[in-house]
Amino acid sequence: MLNVTLLGTGGGMPMPNRFLSSVVMNFNGRKILLDCGEGTQVSMRVNGTGFKSIDIICISHLHGDHIYGLPGLLSTIGNSGRVEDIYIIGPNGIKEVIEGFLITLPYLPYKLNILEDASNLEFMVKKEKIELVELNEKISSDLTIETLGLDHSSPCLGYSFNIRRGRKFNVEKALMNKVPKELWSKLQRNEEVSLNGVKYYSYMVLGDERKGIKLSYTTDTRPTEDIPGFIKESDLYICEGTYGSEEDMHKAIKNKHMTFKEAANLAKKGQVKELLLTHFSPSINDPKEFINNAREVFENLHAGSDGEERVLNFKE
């Protein structure tokens, strides 16, 4: 099960009813943060989201409405008692920006691992942390993070998160591979173990792969040819909808953003299950006023609001 909370749905500048861009994902008690605009900390407190268990922070690009909440958040995480490493993923330039932030944060009790312009990252989700791993054909990860270069006025990344579902234990397979019973539980947890000089792997006791959960996130950008394939069959697609009306198309083109309808068209092409719009222009008082026109293109579309949640479950 994956819990998703929109912490901030505004673009450009914070508004009384909308903080700036941020989303938090919670999987098995471990958290991933997508962007960190102003107000992120406040929204996390309002929504009861803990700070200490944030393991990965994904930044789309380096415009202020997506990163200005980060220095304060990193400080608060340090004050929460966290000592485990945190991964920060972002576009070219993210390392320099973070190093600048660290001038004001010289005593963080944890290490920041900055992954610049990276893709196809594999992670294991453990009870105490999420950990980057190098895989081989015998061990599968719990989480894959893929990135896609977008079309914005600053280097910008879209993100796709694929959460694998644990395979069922296969007794016949374990017996066929002559795996000692005392190792079964460890192998079911995807651990590599040895006994009497013999190595045993999880594939020796587990059945076929089952359908996992996919969440995709793209902001800020114009529509591109690569986005539909990147978001294909996502259970949830969170996408910018900076402008609600097609009358603002000239602004969308000039500022390299999207209208609601353009986002809906991407969702339709990508065959996603649900489109959740975010990153609304300060000129939009009520995004829901513009939803119906976009629903002519893609029906299962909603205008997100701060604090809105989704729960994505594994399905057989």
From Swiss-Prot:
Pfam family, one: Lactamase_B
CDD domains named among the record's database cross-references: RNaseZ_ZiPD-like_MBL-fold
Free-text cofactor note: Binds 2 Zn(2+) ions.
Binding site for Zn(2+) 1: H61, H63, H152, D220
EC number(s) recorded for this UniProt protein: 3.1.26.11
Cofactor(s) the protein requires to work: Zn(2+)
Superkingdom per UniProt: Bacteria
Catalytic activity: Endonucleolytic cleavage of RNA, removing extra 3' nucleotides from tRNA precursor, generating 3' termini of tRNAs. A 3'-hydroxy group is left at the tRNA terminus and a 5'-phosphoryl group is left at the trailer molecule
Matching InterPro entries: Metallo-B-lactamas (IPR001279), RibonucZ/Hydroxyglut_hydro (IPR036866), RNase_Z/BN (IPR013471)
GO molecular function terms noted in the UniProt entry: 3'-tRNA processing endoribonuclease activity; zinc ion binding
Active site: D65 (proton acceptor)
Class of the enzyme per the UniProt entry, highest EC level: hydrolase
Family: Belongs to the RNase Z family.
Name of protein: Ribonuclease Z
Gene that encodes the chain: rnz
